[in-house]
Each structure stands twice: as C-alpha cells, then as structure tokens.
C-alpha cells in the first residue's frame, strides 16, 4: 500500500518523477485521457446544456481498476497531469472516474520535471481549476459539433469518408487560397543593374543601381551611357547599428526554427520535444509565453559569464504578444542552463542544442555592427551605384545563435575595402539582368504555423495535430514540384562593349511545400460557399478568444456553445436540403473527334477527365488524371492526351502488353499481371523495351524463394511493408530479418510462428476449420466463416457453443442476395 499516489499522463514522465520522490510515493500513468466522447455517435446532449457523454476507453478499463485499487488505500492522491487545459481536464476526469475525495486529493503542476520543480509542486498544491476544464470541454464539444454535423454533409454532397473541422478546414483554406494566388500571379519582368569596381590596390567593390529598368531597351540605353565613363566614390556613410537576439522559444517558434535549421516536420518536433520534457531536460513544450523565471534568468547569466565573460551578458525580460498565453508560465528552455548537450539519441540532442542556444542567446548582449553605404557616381549620367557593407564590431549573442529566415534568397552583406570620398574606381563590368516578380511562396509546415498564430487560429496544443490531420485526410500534401525552365536575357558591358546573352533558370520548383489536392480544393470551395461563417478567419480567431475568456472565468461555456449552435445548425439543415452535389467540374472544350464536351472533375476514385455526359445516348469515356495534374490547372491539350491511354506496346511471349493509368497510378499490363511504373516515370514515354525490362524484374521478384511442406513461398512488398506468401497466407516480415536474403530457415521460422499464433487464436472449430471461433480483443470471441465475422456476446459459453448455433448466427449475419431489377430505358 502506497502512502501517496501520484498520477501523471505518460509512463516516461512517471519514471523520471519517481526518481525524485521517496519510497512513500508511487508514481503511475494514466496513459493520456482515460475518457472521451464516443466514436460512433455525437455524444453531446444538445438539449441538456451540451452535456458531454464521456465514456471510458475500452483499453483503459483494466487501468481504471488498478488506479481505483491504488487510490482507495492511499492517504493522498496527487493529480500531476500537464499544466494546460488538456492536463486540467485529465485531472478532472481522473477525480470523477476514480471517485476521489476532495479532502485527500491534491492537484499539482510543474513546467519542468526536475527535483526542485517536483518538490516545489508538492509544497504548493491547489484544487482543480474548473475554468480551465470548461475551456477544454468547450473546445472538445464545439469541435465535435462542427465535425459531426459537417462531415455527413460532405459525404452526401461530395464523397464518402470526408471530414471537416473548425481549425483544419480553415488551415486548408489558407493553403488553397495561396495556391490560387500563385496560379493567378502574372509575372512582370524588369532589368536589375549590378556592377563590379576595383580600387587602385585591386580590391573589389560590388554595387548595384537602386532602381530597375522596365524594358531591355531602357537597360541597354543605360549601359550605352556608361561606355567610356569614369567612376569615383561620391559619398561614404558609416553608421553604428545593433542586432538584438530573438526571444526564447514558444511552441510555434520552436516548430518554425526546427523546420528551418533541422528540417524537422512539425509533428516530429513535438514528439522529440515531448521526450526531452519527460526526461527532465526541457520545460513544458506547449506554451505561447516568452517569459523566463527568475531562476532561469540567473542560471542563464551564470552560464554566459562562465563561457564568454561578463561583457556578453544582458538580462532581458521579453513581453508575450500572443493572446491566450495566460496559462503558460514560461518559454521552452533547458532545465539546466549549464548543460549544452545531453546523453540522448541524435534528434533529441539536436533539438536540445537548438533550445539551449536560443535560450542562452536571448540573455546575451546585442551584436554591435558598423554599416557602411557607398555611393559611386559616373561622369556621363546622373544615376549612381550603391555598395553596402557590414562589419561586426562586437559579436554579442551572434557568438551563439542567429535566427533563420524563410527567405531563401536573402542577400547577406559582406565587408567593403577601405574607401575614401572622391577615390577613383575602375569598372570591370556592368550587367543588366532580366529579373521577374515572384508570387508569395507556398506554405511550409512551419510557415503555416506562423500564419495560424498571426491570425489567432489554434493554440500551441493544436498546431501539430492540425497539420497532421489535413495531410492524413488527403486534403493537402507535401509535394516536390520540378517547375519549368524559363529563359531570361542579360546584357554585359565590359571593355566598352555590350554583349547580349540568353540564359535559363528553373522556376516554380518547390520541395516539401504544402499543396492542396483536388479533393482538398473541392471540399474547401463547398465549405466556403455554404458555411462562410465557419470558414471565416476572424470567426475562428474569435472562437479561440472565447475559449480564453472561459479559461479566465469571464464567459460561460454552455452559453457560448448555445449561441454558436443556434446559428450553425439551421445552416447545416438548409445545405442538406437545398444544395446539389459538388465535383469541382471544369468544362475544357469540345473533343474534336466526337464533338462531345471534354471536362475534368472529381470522381469516386479521384480526379478524372471525361468526354460526354451521363445523359447522352452514348456513354461517357473516362480517363484518370496523372500524378502532378490538377483539376484547376490541367489544360485542354493535356486532358485530351489522356484518352490516348491505354497505349498498346506489342506482344511479349504471346501476351498483350499495354501501358495505362489506374487507381494506384501508371502501370504496364502484361497479360493478367499489373506492374507499376517507377515514381515520376512518364506513361507516354514507356517503350516496349522498357516494358520487357519491367516484366523481367516482375518475374524475378515473383519467383519462389523457398518451399514449405511442398508449397512454394514467394515474397513482395505491400501497403504494410515486406511480406512472404505461402498457401494463400500473407505473413509480415519483421525488420530483424534480411528481406533481400531470406534463408530457408527464416521462411520456415516465419511460417511456423504464424501458424502457431493462428492456432492459439482458434478455440473451437467445425468442418476442418471452415467454421471456427477465435479469440478477440478485450476477452471477447469472434465466430468466423470465410469473410463473414460475428462478434459473440461477452457472456457466451464457448465450450457449450454448438455448430447449429454457429450456423444460425452466420445465416442471420450473411446478407441476402437480391436480383437486380432491369432499369427502364429513359424515353426520348
């Protein structure tokens, strides 16, 4: 019997905390939320104050029994879940579900898992903050209402399996709108003038004209003016400047900087940060505060003075700009500022070092800079060239850390040679280069987080799940675009001669940027057209502010939900009744062969092109869009070319060979075999020779690798990874095996292990196993015949269960076959 029971969310956190507390304390984990809304129904009583119907998760029932047993005999129960709204809700659910008594239940919070933080929390317990609980409930219930009512509308009007959400749908809207801005952007060209000069000592000075010329003719005329010109320094201005360090990390700035510097995804950053927090290396990682505690300020100063000297220290208190940051007590920082690295795996070390450097730099002196601007004049015209230079006089915080930017082409100013006013310079060359205006860049995961934060949409705990959700739903994907080659012109004046050149550059290429899919664009347009309030950026931000007000006790959560729902629900009902289906259809033109309309739209299996209409006497012809094509951007010519598929390539060993595109991408068909093309391979460029190569590789891959009990064993790679196939049974191959070189012993081991597991699952069988009862999860049993499965009631006596009972249940479960009624031909 434990005198004190401490309940935290994760086992890793429990393990770390248990090291700091004595033998009188037992630290256990709730493994996250122990209750949630049901997955198969709304779970909210709309007519009774929006009361949630919380259910204990099936996988937590045994855990609840254990926790009840532990807490029933404990003198004190300490609820030590995280210090945010989710953590407060977990503490409340534990108190309610375990029926804890107020007199011996204490709520403790800490923003770092260190001995001093834990001991301090034990000394300063509090009660559950119901304002925070209600703020979490309001978010959970409102998001359930939106998702549960909007998603079925999408199933009826667009496609089954779709979903909508208050934050996720707005995030998709941002990405769709940015993509359309890029597609609609009209590029304008101008000519940028750059030059290179030298001093009498041969030192190089690079300069540029402050303005661009609109046309090539204007640029060439300017170069003509410089033929035979003499150049000198017109003016030289030197000014002191300083650079200040960035504040310590919040959740969003950590996600952004980890993406730029470490190339981590947002979800990876949060996973790694969670491990660092649970191991006691950093403070809590879901925060929008830039504050540092007095203890942190003091330890940071000590570390800076010890490492770099007193002159590098400058204690700073940063102001938190983000709304709703009242719950977060501190920025993300190391728990021990004297530790620059940790005993952990590579990714954890990388992120820790980033946090350590950023925190340390935030408490360091400004960098002192000397900026020099030089104007260079010519004797043949009134324009002047400008050269900029920068010299670091005192590096300050730059000794440790420099924040990255999203601008990949930002120019860095270098040092200039010593120059004097009136000094004569020799010109090496002057170049007029055609440059083009660029649209705003596509969002990265990190820049999307930044935009959501700027708009007040979401909170630290929601950024990563939102970005994961919109990708998992197939509304957005991280894509690599090859772009296209664009020519540009350049004129160079050197030795009093102007030389023209035509060069080329690749534009529109993007890697790892967020791009909307066709389904994402169609869903977005439907929601914007019919649910403009939900999709409004200001409304979404206003809802977040309401949650903040609830957390502060300034707003009633059920009244807030009632006000929202009375406006929202009637719109849902109206859209269900009065709107048609949405496919994102675009009419591209007329098929020259048939005279029928050529269009593109969203179909059951994705984007497709279509010749003709369903109402025509002649059935429409369909073709799938290729990877990289989009309903919004495909041209008439590109769509028409799709109908050249399938392409007949010839005959190989008496079997027809063709190339085509299907649900899962482009493929070569060889008889009845389907062979996928390599990623990025052009379906229109595949030759018969290439097809033969693929067929040969397929035959080799499908050849038996072994036999077992006289039956051949083959191998392959499927959706769930590598497998072997024996006797129509698929068996996954774990990583511990060398899949490329499986031995007979490996194969035998894999098959026998599979057979053993299958036999252990079967508790009763009839007709040589064609009808059987198998063990299922949670102590239940499943009756199986072929593909038909029936879950037996929990109180079923399997030992006494008869074949007749089994057949009766299976007959009841098997759907009756119905004869399709012949359709009546429409009258013309």
Predicted regions located by residue number:
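Intrinsically disordered, low-complexity regulatory segments
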Residues: 1-140, 149, 210, 309, ...
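C-terminal or mid-to-C-terminal helical accessory/interaction module adjacent to the motor/catalytic core
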Residues: 113-197, 238-242
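Metal- or metallocofactor-binding catalytic centers and their adjacent structured scaffolds
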Residues: 214-248, 255, 420-426, 431-434, ...
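A conserved hydrophobic secondary-structure block that centers on an alpha-helix together
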Residues: 255-257, 261-269
């Amino acid at each position: 019997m434990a005198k004190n029971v401490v309940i935290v969310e994760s086992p890793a956190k429990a393990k770390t905390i248990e090291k700091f507390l004595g033998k009188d304390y037992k630290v256990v984990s709730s493994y996250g939320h122990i209750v949630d809304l049901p997955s198969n129904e709304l779970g909210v009583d709309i007519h009774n104050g929006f009361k949630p119907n919380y259910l204990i998760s099936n996988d937590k029932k045994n855990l609840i029994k254990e926790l009840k047993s532990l807490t029933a005999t404990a003198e004190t129960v300490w609820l030590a879940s995280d210090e945010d709204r989710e953590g407060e809700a977990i503490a409340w659910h534990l108190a309610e579900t375990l029926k804890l008594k107020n007199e011996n239940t204490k709520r403790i919070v800490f923003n770092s898992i260190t001995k001093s933080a834990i001991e301090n929390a034990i000394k300063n317990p509090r009660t559950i903050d119901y304002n925070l609980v209600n703020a979490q409930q309001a978010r959970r219930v409102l998001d359930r209402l939106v998702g549960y009512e909007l998603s079925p509308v999408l199933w009826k009007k667009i496609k089954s399996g779709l979903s909508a959400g208050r934050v996720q749908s707005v995030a998709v809207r941002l990405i769709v709108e940015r993509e359309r801005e890029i597609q609609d952007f009209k590029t304008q060209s101008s000519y940028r003038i750059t030059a290179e000069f030298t001093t009498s000592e041969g030192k190089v000075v690079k300069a540029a004209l402050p303005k661009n010329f609109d046309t090539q003719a204007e640029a060439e005329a300017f170069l003509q003016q410089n033929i035979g010109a003499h150049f000198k320094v017109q003016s030289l201005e030197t000014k002191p400047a300083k650079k200040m360090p960035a504040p310590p990390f919040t959740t969003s700035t950590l996600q952004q900087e980890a993406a730029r510097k470490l190339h981590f995804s947002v979800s990876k950053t949060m996973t790694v940060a969670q491990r660092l927090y649970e191991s006691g290396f950093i403070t809590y990682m879901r925060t929008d505060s830039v504050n540092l505690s007095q203890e942190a300020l003091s330890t940071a100063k000590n570390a800076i003075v010890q490492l770099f000297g007193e002159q590098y220290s400058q204690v700073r208190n940063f102001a938190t700009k983000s709304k709703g940051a009242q719950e977060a007590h501190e920025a993300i920082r190391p728990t021990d500022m004297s530790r620059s690295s940790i005993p952990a795996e590579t990714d954890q070390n990388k992120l820790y070092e980033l946090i350590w450097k950023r925190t340390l730099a935030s408490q360091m002196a400004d960098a002192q800079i000397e900026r020099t601007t030089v104007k260079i004049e010519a004797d043949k015209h009134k324009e002047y060239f400008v050269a900029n230079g920068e010299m670091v006089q005192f590096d300050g915080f730059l000794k440790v850390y420099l924040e990255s930017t999203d601008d990949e082409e930002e120019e860095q100013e270098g040092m200039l040679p010593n120059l004097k006013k009136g000094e004569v310079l020799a010109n090496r060359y002057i170049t007029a280069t055609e440059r083009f205006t660029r649209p705003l860049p596509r969002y990265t995961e990190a820049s999307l987080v930044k935009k959501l934060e700027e708009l007040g949409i979401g909170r630290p705990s929601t950024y990563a799940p939102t970005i994961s959700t919109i990708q998992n739903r197939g509304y957005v994907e991280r894509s690599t675009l090859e772009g296209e080659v664009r020519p540009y012109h350049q004129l160079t004046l050197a030795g009093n001669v102007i030389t023209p050149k035509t060069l080329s550059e690749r534009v529109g290429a993007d890697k790892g940027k967020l791009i909307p899919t066709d389904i994402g664009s169609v869903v977005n347009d439907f929601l914007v057209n019919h649910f403009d309030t939900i999709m409004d950026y200001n409304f979404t931000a206003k809802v977040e502010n309401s949650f903040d007000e609830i957390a502060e006790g300034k707003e009633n959560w059920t009244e807030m939900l009632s006000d929202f729902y009375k406006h929202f629900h009637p719109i849902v009902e109206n859209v269900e009744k009065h709107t048609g289906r949405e496919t994102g259809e675009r009419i591209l033109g007329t098929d020259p062969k048939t005279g029928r309309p050529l269009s593109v739209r969203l179909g059951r299996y994705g984007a497709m092109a279509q010749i003709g209409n369903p109402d025509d006497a002649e059935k429409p012809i369909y073709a799938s869009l290729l990877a990289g094509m989009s309903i919004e951007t495909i041209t008439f010519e590109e769509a028409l070319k799709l109908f050249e598929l399938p392409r007949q390539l010839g005959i190989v060993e008496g079997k027809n060979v063709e190339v085509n595109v299907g649900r899962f991408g482009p493929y070569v068909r060889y008889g009845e075999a389907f062979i996928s093309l390599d990623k990025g391979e052009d379906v229109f460029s595949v030759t018969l020779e290439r097809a033969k190569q693929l067929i040969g590789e397929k035959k080799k891959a499908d050849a038996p690798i072994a036999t077992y009990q006289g039956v051949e064993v083959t191998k392959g790679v499927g959706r769930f990874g590598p497998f072997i196939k024996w006797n129509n049974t698929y068996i996954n191959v774990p990583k511990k095996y060398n899949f490329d070189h499986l031995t007979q012993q490996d194969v035998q081991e894999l098959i026998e292990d599979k057979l053993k597991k299958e036999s252990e699952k079967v508790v009763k069988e009839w007709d040589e196993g064609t009808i059987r009862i198998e063990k299922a999860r949670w102590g239940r049993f499943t009756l199986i015949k072929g593909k038909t499965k029936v879950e037996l009631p929990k109180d079923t006596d399997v030992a006494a269960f008869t074949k007749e009972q089994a057949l009766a249940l299976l007959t009841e479960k098997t759907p009756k076959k119905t004869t399709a009624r012949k359709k009546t031909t429409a009258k013309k």
